[in-house]
């Protein structure tokens, strides 16, 4: 069944909170990656202070120094991974609370005065188990950090073989739209945005199920953000209504809530919402 439904005031309030939380985590990630890129560049630029190395007069010594720099960068990037994970993990926990409490708030506005606590086992399930896009969050971020390490080391080696100055190498690694750090930052934002969205929609479903179990007559509805970049499948899903335990269906695919297809082409950067 598909109907046209106007998002109510309380649902809009919850969506605004979600948007503000997402913007906050993006700012935090940008700050972390920006500082790390500066730290790496500073380590590399230390070589430019050594006039005996600038013209590659001592190739053997320079190679040894290069390896030492790589080890120091490894330490900086491991710290980056820990900070990024901590920020995103906190954000995902907030997403679950927003989705669950926001659903209760909306149901009360619709004349269903229910109140029950969040089930912590459901939180663990949503944050640590049910990521269907690929591996767990920490493993994915660790792989991204390892890729960043390899990219930076490759740039270091390439700079040496090309006869570039250390300042030039540092600039290429730390800045620019195609720098390793810029690519890694964008990847971290996609992970945070996609996982945060999935967690919030799943917590909404958890709350809907709890309400249903306590006797509330609740149905769920898919609400798509309709504009020029909306996926055709999500446009088709817009307005579909299902029983709480029934999946939404489109193009041979099924999902219990937005962000739950398990297909990156459907889930990454999804902006759809689950309403009741």
Predicted regions and their residues:
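N-terminal leader/targeting and assembly helices and adjacent pre-domain segments
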Residues: 1-182
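Acidic, glycine-rich two-metal-ion catalytic cores of nucleic acid-processing enzymes
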Residues: 183-276
């Amino acid at each position: 069944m598909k109907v046209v439904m106007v998002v109510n005031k309380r649902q809009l309030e919850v969506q605004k909170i979600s948007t503000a939380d997402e913007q906050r985590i993006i700012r935090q990630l940008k700050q972390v990656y920006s500082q790390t890129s500066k730290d790496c560049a500073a380590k590399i630029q230390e070589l430019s202070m050594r006039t005996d190395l600038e013209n590659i007069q001592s190739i053997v010594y320079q190679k040894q120094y290069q390896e030492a720099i790589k080890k120091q960068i490894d330490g900086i990037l491991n710290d980056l991974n820990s900070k990024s994970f901590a920020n995103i993990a906190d954000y995902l926990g907030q997403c679950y609370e927003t989705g669950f409490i926001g659903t209760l708030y909306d149901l009360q506005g619709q004349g269903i005065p229910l109140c029950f606590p969040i089930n912590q086992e459901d939180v663990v399930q949503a944050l640590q188990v049910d990521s269907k896009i690929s591996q767990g969050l920490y493993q994915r971020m660790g792989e991204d950090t390892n890729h960043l390490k390899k990219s930076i080391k490759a740039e270091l080696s390439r700079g040496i073989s090309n006869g570039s100055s250390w300042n030039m190498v540092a600039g290429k690694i730390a800045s620019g739209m195609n720098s390793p750090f810029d690519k890694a930052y964008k990847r971290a934002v996609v992970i945070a945005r996609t996982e945060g969205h999935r967690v919030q929609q799943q917590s909404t479903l958890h709350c809907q199920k709890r309400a249903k179990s306590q006797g509330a007559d609740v149905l769920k509805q898919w609400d798509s953000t309709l504009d020029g970049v909306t996926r055709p499948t999500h446009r088709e899903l817009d307005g579909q209504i299902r029983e709480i335990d029934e999946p939404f269906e489109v193009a041979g695919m099924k999902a219990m809530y937005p962000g739950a297809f398990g297909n990156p082409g459907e889930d990454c950067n999804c902006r759809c919402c689950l309403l009741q």
